[in-house]
Each structure stands twice: as C-alpha cells, then as structure tokens.
Amino acid sequence: LFTLVVLLMVSADMAFAGFGCPRDQYKCNSHCQSIGCRAGYCDAVTLWLRCTCTDCNGKK
C-alpha cells in the first residue's frame, strides 16, 4: 500500500511538470519556442507526461 501511494505521488508530480502535457501539446510547443527551440511535443516514452523540445541550439 505504501508503495502504491509513493507511485501515485510521483506520477502527480510528473503530470504537473509537463508544460501542458499530456492534455495540451500546443502549450508544450509554445513553451519550447519561448526558450529558443524550434518545436516541442509530448513524449510517448513517458506516456505523454513530459514535454520534449527539439532543435534547441545546445539547450534542452
């Protein structure tokens, strides 16, 4: 039971830290463009919870 509670807490943190992901990919894209990247998308590897930026000229 304790392990389940910890996993749920970690999942909630990841969902709030996703710059719009998984619900708003446009917000993720806008975030990435605002920091100088070409585009952004919600990463399927993390079940669409993480915003991944592309072509950032040395930034990530």
Swiss-Prot record:
GO terms for cellular component: extracellular region; membrane; other organism cell membrane. The keyword Disulfide bond applies. GO terms for molecular function: lipid binding. Beta-D-GlcNAc-(1->4)-Mur2Ac(oyl-L-Ala-gamma-D-Glu-L-Lys-D-Ala-D-Ala)-di-trans,octa-cis-undecaprenyl diphosphate binds at residues 19-21, 31, 51. GO terms for biological process: defense response to bacterium; innate immune response. InterPro entries: Defensin_invertebrate/fungal (IPR001542), Scorpion_toxin-like_sf (IPR036574). Residues 1-17 form the signal peptide. Pfam families: Defensin_2. Keywords: Antibiotic, Antimicrobial, Defensin, Disulfide bond, Immunity, Innate immunity, Lipid-binding, Membrane, Secreted, Signal, Target cell membrane, Target membrane. Expressed in hemocytes. It comes from the Eukaryota. The keyword Membrane applies. Disulfide bonds join 21-42, 28-51, 32-53, 37-56. It is found in: Secreted; Target cell membrane. SUPFAM superfamilies: Scorpion toxin-like. Residues 22-25, 43-49 are annotated as: Binds to membrane interface. Has the structural arrangement of an alpha-helix connected to a beta-sheet by disulfide bonds (CSalpha/beta). Belongs to the invertebrate defensin family. Antibacterial peptide mostly active against Gram-positive bacteria. It acts by selectively inhibiting peptidoglycan biosynthesis through complex formation with the cell wall precursor lipid II (1:1 molar ratio) thus inhibiting cell wall synthesis. It does not disrupt cell membranes. Is noticeably less potent than Cg-Defh2 and Cg-Defm. Shows no or limited activities against Gram-negative bacteria. This is Hemocyte defensin Cg-Defh1.
